[in-house]
Design a protein with these regions (language model features):
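Glycine- and charge-enriched low-complexity intrinsically disordered segments
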Residues: 84-136
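Short, basic/aromatic beta-hairpin or loop at an interaction surface
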Residues: 27-40, 92-109, 147
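Short, compositionally biased
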Residues: 66-87, 137-149
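Active-site loop ensemble at the mouth of alpha/beta enzyme cores that anchors a bound cofactor
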Residues: 1-31, 83, 87
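Extended hydrophobic-aromatic, low-complexity segments
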Residues: 50-51, 60-61, 67-72, 82-84, ...
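Short, well-ordered loop/turn sites that connect or cap secondary structure elements
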Residues: 49-53, 119
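Short, conserved secondary-structure segments in the cores of folded domains
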Residues: 45-48, 115
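Short, surface-exposed secondary-structure boundary micro-motifs
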Residues: 44, 57, 63-64, 124, ...
Length: 149
């Protein structure tokens, strides 16, 4: 899923299809991050993670950009340790607050996965970025400009 703290800058967050010493693979699950983060809907609008619920449709992407719709089967909010991760694409800077856990992975530009617990300054991960514009209730407003920090 594309997830980020800004509507115009989102990180490709991988599902939990890779097991760890703590858990079995759970390919149906995406640990998306803090509830204030945005995700991209199949219709091109954004939604806050806090707005998602069972039955909500979200956009699922692979590392090559191929997208499909998926319906949420279960949505849960938990209190967990979190990390702030920032990145830059051109002149745009974006961030995400993600759970501090080895099972949370981003996708590198070569298609390989990297856990947020192993990210290092200078690592390159896949992200969606475009010039900032205004949004109102998730819909892009073409004649507005908003600077988010």
């Amino acid at each position: 899923m594309l997830i980020g703290s800004r509507a115009n800058f989102m990180f490709l967050v991988h599902n939990e299809s890779v097991g760890s010493s703590f858990t079995s693979p759970r390919p149906f699950r995406v640990n998306a991050g803090a509830v204030h983060c945005y995700t991209l809907s199949p219709d091109g609008n954004t939604k806050y993670l806090s707005e998602l619920e069972t039955g909500s449709e979200v956009l699922i992407l692979n590392s090559k950009g191929k997208a499909r719709r998926a319906a949420i089967g279960r949505c849960k909010i938990e209190k967990r340790p979190m990390l702030l991760i920032k990145a830059k694409v051109g002149n745009e800077i974006g961030g995400i607050i993600a759970q501090d856990a080895e099972t949370i992975r981003f996708v590198k530009s070569n298609g390989k996965l990297v856990s947020v617990t192993h990210l290092k300054k200078g690592d390159s991960v896949l992200a969606f970025s475009k010039e900032a514009s205004g949004r109102h209730f998730g819909m892009e407003v073409a004649d507005e400009y908003i600077l988010e920090k």
